[in-house]
Amino acid sequence: NVFESARKCVADNKKVGISIMAEKEIYAVSLTFDDEDIYYIPVYGFVLADYLIEKMTELINTSKNRSIVIDNLKDYLPIFDKTGVDEHSFMDIAVAAYLIHPNNDRYDYEALSKEYMSMLVMSRQELLGKQSIKEAYDKDDDSLLKLACLTSYVNYKCSDIITDILKKEEMYELYETIEMPLIFVLYDMQKFGIRVDKEALSDYSKVLVEKINVLEKEIYEEA
């Protein structure tokens, strides 16, 4: 069982790269937990969307040490509204890459594979053209499979490299204590339609900057 094997990896604090092919609905997932262990599981036959969500939730909630490596996590949080997932389960590789190079234009699997793996891969445009995820899924060729597997593989392969850079640059604590929780805060604001008070937001930004400065000072003093 693919999900059971992935859960064992996560329980041992090993990274599992995942990708979710979804728009309004989930159509497929891909899991990578070794160079040779790359799996694609589409919604098909007895494998229903609810089944995939249930198994993904079980896998995610097995992780307590950011072992689930995903890109653009906020886009996929609606999938888990009913089941619930723990923030500490995830490493958002795109957010981590942004911290390292905030001026880059893109943080997708193609950009990350080139920068951190020195590997050129087919882009989403090359694989899907102008098709949506749903259109590619309905067409039932291997383009969506390739996109899903490339994404989960790059997430998996880049995770340790990017984590090491964050730690070397003394940004990992910032990433873990501020950037990752902020993903869930922003999603909740979006979900519940919280009206943003500009003055309050400005005040919060000042507090956040102060906290970051204190954190940077503590890290510097400990170094």
Locations of regions flagged by a protein language model:
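Mixed-charge, glycine-rich, non-catalytic linkers/tails in nucleic-acid processing enzymes
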Residues: D81, L112, M122-A223
